[in-house]
Amino acid sequence: IVLAAERQIIELVMTITRKIISDELEERPEIILGVVREALGRVRDQDHLNIHVSLDDYERILQSRNELQSIVGSEKSFTITADTVLERGGCLIETSFGTVEAGIDTQLESIRKAFQEMLP
């Protein structure tokens, strides 16, 4: 019974966290820029990147193109794509070696899995 309650508590906490973050993304859409910056930091050594963001985040990221260029380096190229599948806060970066998922939902799912792995 205790284990079942712990699992339910984890799911409840994750649901509440998703709601709070969703509301925060609505109020502060610039948050996505931090998500993209962090993701780019993980794939800096690639010659070309394709950054996928949601339709809601596309304009914000497009406006930050110069800043993103300074992160990847002036000799590197990248494209920014509005992805209809991604939700606000979502980010995928395609490289020649594969795809990096770095959106808010991906990060929250990793946290949820880590909590569940701690349970017996």
Regions found by a protein language model. Give the residues of each.
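Elongated, mostly alpha-helical coiled-coil "stalk/stator" tethers of large membrane protein machines
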Residues: I1-P120
